[in-house]
Curated annotation (Swiss-Prot):
Cofactor(s) required, per the database record: Zn(2+)
GO biological process, one term: tRNA modification
UniProt protein name: Glutamyl-Q tRNA(Asp) synthetase
Sequence motif: 'KMSKS' region, positions: 244-248
EC number(s) stated in the UniProt entry for this protein: 6.1.1.-
GO molecular function: ATP binding; glutamate-tRNA ligase activity; zinc ion binding
Role, per record: Catalyzes the tRNA-independent activation of glutamate in presence of ATP and the subsequent transfer of glutamate onto a tRNA(Asp). Glutamate is transferred on the 2-amino-5-(4,5-dihydroxy-2-cyclopenten-1-yl) moiety of the queuosine in the wobble position of the QUC anticodon.
Intervals of motif 'HIGH' region: 32-42
Family: Belongs to the class-I aminoacyl-tRNA synthetase family. GluQ subfamily.
Amino acid sequence: MATSSELPDHLYEQMEAGQRLRNQGYRGRFAPSPTGPLHLGNLCTALVSWLQARLANGAWLLRVDDLDQPRNRVGAVESLQQDLHWLGLDWDGPVVFQSRRRGLYNSFLSALRRQGKLYACRCSRRMLADISAPAGRHLVYPGTCRDLELFWGWHEGRLPSWRLRVSKEFSHTSGDVILRRADGFIAYHLATVVDELTLGISEVVRGEDLLVAMNAQLALINEISARPVIYRHVPLLCDDQGRKLAKREGHAGLDSLRSEGLGPSHVVGWLAASQSLVPFGAELTAGELLSELKKKEGVLKSVLKP
């Protein structure tokens, strides 16, 4: 495992600054992608994450995960901020944009590569699908490219992706994690972990669909020798066919609800009821919900899954 002292001074200082922030108290975050309007599932996660931070008298940051630029939609950043304001969910400090932190991610990538922690991988998604586990199970990368010659990709005239050699304890839960994609984009796990550590995030509250990402992120944190982040997961909202709500499926956002005449207290009440925080039919603002939960110790934590 790499030690923090092996990181370049400027990265070590960023890690130390993040740790100091964590030591000061609870710090949570909400990290949507600007790929379209937030649907009710996104907003439910935002509400629960905000409540968890405010119940702890902590900070709640808004981070925009906009690295995958071809998928970003014009106006989505402004829209998601307006939706959060409309629901009464306030954040602390300026909005953090991942697209403005590429240099930091690449510095961590270079440091890990110099330490011999990475290797080039030529596996495509199709190749991995051919060796994947049965449908519905998470694929653990089998290490196909671990022992390939380092520069195979350039010899073949194409760029590789770069994977992290995880320690034995994570080999059966995450496998070797992609940190940079073959198209040159920094991978989700690297950007997310670097942000959690350098922004001082102490606990991540996110949708249950991201539970599969936890082991990969813990494996990377382990290699950087940082104190693990606490992960909590919110049960997913599903449509009447049992499918999780998704932007690509066109599931309802706030615009359609507002057009029906529903106000913030209706939506907050419904979202809270969907997590058994209040009875269905309750109408209350985010601030009123927070006040109610302060009287009911442990109710919110009972909703969250590790």
